């Protein structure tokens, strides 16, 4: 059997064993899956106990010290502080088994929760706007450049523009670059003669 087919058969065997093993997982009862519900809004944290208090009082403890007692299954912690309010929270209804939760949360008054799709949308829109502005600037500068420099080359003009520019007088010579007179015996006039 070629080695390619061997790997395919081995892969199918592993997949079937994995699927067969998943069927044997026991599903826990709904009673054992009860969990706390934690809601954070601004600097407030609301804990909801998985037990219903029915007609008895519910006792809330933090680090095994009683902090709250009510007939509701939730507790609201206002002005939550990560340092002061973090710890193990337990809720107990009467003499029933208590549920434990370790809570450590960072909160702030003016925080806004942003989901992943909002962040991706903001980034994509920002990139599109930036590219759009880049293209507008490119095409605008390209069209202005074409209007500013007309390319007209005539056969007899030698590549120079025609019209009024042709009648323009030559530029005024700069006094710093005056030509050396033949009557002067300066350093530069001597160098010039040796070079010939």
From Swiss-Prot:
Phosphotyrosine found at: 177, 188
Subunit structure: The TCR-CD3 complex is composed of a CD3D/CD3E and a CD3G/CD3E heterodimers that preferentially associate with TCRalpha and TCRbeta, respectively, to form TCRalpha/CD3E/CD3G and TCRbeta/CD3G/CD3E trimers. In turn, the hexamer interacts with CD3Z homodimer to form the TCR-CD3 complex. Alternatively, TCRalpha and TCRbeta can be replaced by TCRgamma and TCRdelta. Interacts with CD6. Interacts (via Proline-rich sequence) with NCK1; the interaction is ligand dependent but independent of tyrosine kinase activation.
Top-rank taxon, per record: Eukaryota
Spans annotated as NUMB-binding region: 164-181
Main location: membrane
Cytoplasmic side: 138-196
UniProt subcellular location: Cell membrane
Residues in the signal sequence: 1-21
Modification after translation (UniProt): Phosphorylated on Tyr residues after T-cell receptor triggering by LCK in association with CD4/CD8.
Protein function: Part of the TCR-CD3 complex present on T-lymphocyte cell surface that plays an essential role in adaptive immune response. When antigen presenting cells (APCs) activate T-cell receptor (TCR), TCR-mediated signals are transmitted across the cell membrane by the CD3 chains CD3D, CD3E, CD3G and CD3Z. All CD3 chains contain immunoreceptor tyrosine-based activation motifs (ITAMs) in their cytoplasmic domain. Upon TCR engagement, these motifs become phosphorylated by Src family protein tyrosine kinases LCK and FYN, resulting in the activation of downstream signaling pathways.
Annotated transmembrane regions: 117-137
Occurrences of domain Ig-like (ranges): 28-102
SMART domains: IGc2 (SM00408), ITAM (SM00077)
UniProt topology in membrane: Single-pass type I membrane protein
Entry GO terms, CC: alpha-beta T cell receptor complex; external side of plasma membrane
Keywords attached to this entry: Adaptive immunity, Cell membrane, Disulfide bond, Immunity, Immunoglobulin domain, Membrane, Phosphoprotein, Receptor, Signal, Transmembrane, Transmembrane helix
Stretches the record annotates as Disordered: 150-196
Record topology, Extracellular segments: 22-116
Disulphide bond pairs: 49-91
Pfam families linked: Ig_5, ITAM
Protein name: T-cell surface glycoprotein CD3 epsilon chain
GO MF: transmembrane signaling receptor activity
Region feature Proline-rich sequence, mapped onto this chain: 168-175
């Amino acid at each position: 059997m070629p080695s390619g087919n061997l790997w395919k058969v081995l892969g199918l065997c592993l997949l079937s064993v994995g699927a067969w093993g998943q069927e044997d997982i026991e599903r826990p009862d709904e009673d054992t899956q009860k969990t706390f519900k934690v809601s954070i809004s601004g600097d407030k944290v609301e804990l909801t106990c998985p037990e219903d208090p029915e007609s008895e009082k519910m006792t809330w403890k933090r680090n095994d010290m009683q902090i709250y007692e009510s007939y509701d299954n939730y507790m609201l912690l206002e002005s939550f502080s990560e340092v002061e309010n973090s710890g193990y929270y337990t809720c107990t209804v009467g003499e029933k088994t208590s549920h434990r939760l370790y809570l450590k949360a960072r909160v702030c008054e003016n925080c806004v929760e942003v989901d992943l799709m909002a962040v991706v949308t903001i980034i994509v829109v920002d990139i599109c706007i930036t590219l759009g502005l880049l293209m507008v600037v490119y095409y605008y500068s390209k069209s202005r450049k074409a209007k500013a420099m007309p390319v007209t080359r005539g056969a007899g003009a030698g590549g120079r523009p025609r019209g009024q520019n042709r009648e323009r007088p030559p530029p005024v010579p700069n006094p710093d670059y005056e030509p050396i007179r033949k009557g002067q015996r300066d350093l530069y006039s001597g160098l010039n003669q040796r070079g010939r």
